[in-house]
Structures are given as C-alpha cells and as structure tokens.
C-alpha cells in the first residue's frame, strides 16, 4: 500500500510539537513495514468512506482514506480532537 498526504495533513503536521512529529515519523515507518502492527492500532472507523485511524504515540491519531491500493492521510491531531470527529 502506498501512502500519500493531503495538504491539510501536512499543515497540521507542521503545527505539531517536535516530539509528536518524531512519533509520527516512527509510526509511518512502522506502517510501511507492517500496517497490521498492533502498536499502530490501525482500524477502519468509517465503512461507507473507507476511513482508517492509526495511533501516533500515546495521545495522537492520524486519519486516512483508502483509495484502491493507496491511503491518503488527511488528518493528524490529539486524541481528544479525534474523539470529536467520530
């Protein structure tokens, strides 16, 4: 599976604290090796739109939408904001 990021994701990422950016990079590397790794808690959260969630460190999540064999990451932020999106 190939990963891409939206402009919104990149803007949100740039505003994250440096330690969270590091966690995001580590999570992405892990995702590239094994999307099913239990540390990512990669799961479908919206069946109708093929939207998935992945853990980024302890307090952050990233959201992506599957499009064929690709995933487009479109949101990253604190778990509290993630809960509001659901």
What is the predicted function of each stretch?
Residues 2-4, 11, 18, 56-86:
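Enriched for short, Lys/Arg-rich terminal
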Residues 13, 28:
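Short amphipathic alpha-helical/adjacent loop interface patches that line ligand
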Residues 15-18, 33:
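Secondary-structure boundary motif
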Residues 29-54:
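A short, surface-exposed loop/turn module that caps and links secondary-structure elements
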């Amino acid at each position: 599976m190939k990963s891409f990021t939206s402009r919104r994701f990149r803007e949100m990422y740039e505003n994250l604290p440096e330690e969270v950016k590091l966690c995001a990079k580590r999570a992405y590397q892990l995702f590239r090796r094994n999307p099913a790794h239990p540390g990512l808690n990669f799961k479908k959260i919206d069946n109708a739109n093929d939207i998935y969630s992945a853990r980024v460190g302890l307090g952050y999540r990233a959201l992506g939408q599957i499009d064929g064999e690709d995933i487009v990451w479109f949101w990253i932020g604190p778990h509290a904001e993630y809960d509001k999106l659901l």
